[in-house]
Amino acid sequence: MLGLDTNVLVRLLIEDDASQTRRARKLVDTAIAEQETVLVSLSVLLETEWVLRSRYEVPPETILGLFRAALEARELAFEDEAAVEEALFNWQDSQSGFSDCLIVAHHRQLGCRSTATFDVYAARLPGAFKA
């Protein structure tokens, strides 16, 4: 299994550096050719959202589209994919940030009855409440 770091995933999504994008694509293609899983962890996904939003000023709806396309890409596997899908679904209609949506969704997938939060917007997510 090959795990991707945030900077590699960002290159694959944004393609802003031709040399690094080629190298990232080659890494993934080689892993796939060798029948390896290419994994995107939850922490990498969270950091990627932060980098895209803060460094590249990518709007949330564009990030949502990029993440959905990555989920549909057969060459990538995601840690707790069900939670990622749920988080993206909740994020599209929420005032909460992606990280809050993913935290609540991941907790649900782990079997938590709910997520306690002091965040007013996160408390509005399905499966969360204001502590």
Predicted region positions:
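Short, well-structured N-terminal submotif of metal-dependent ribonuclease cores
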Residues: 1-40, 55-62, 130
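Histidine- and aromatic-rich ligand-binding microenvironments
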Residues: 5, 40-41, 96-97, 119-120
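Conserved glycosyltransferase catalytic-site signature
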Residues: 6, 81, 100-101
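A generic structural signal for short hydrophobic patches within well-formed alpha-helices
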Residues: 9, 45, 122-123
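Short, high-confidence coil segments that cap the C-terminus of an alpha-helix
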Residues: 35-36, 96, 112
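Acidic catalytic patch
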Residues: 42-44, 65-93
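Acidic, PIN/NYN-like endoribonuclease modules and their adjacent C-terminal/linker elements
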Residues: 104-131
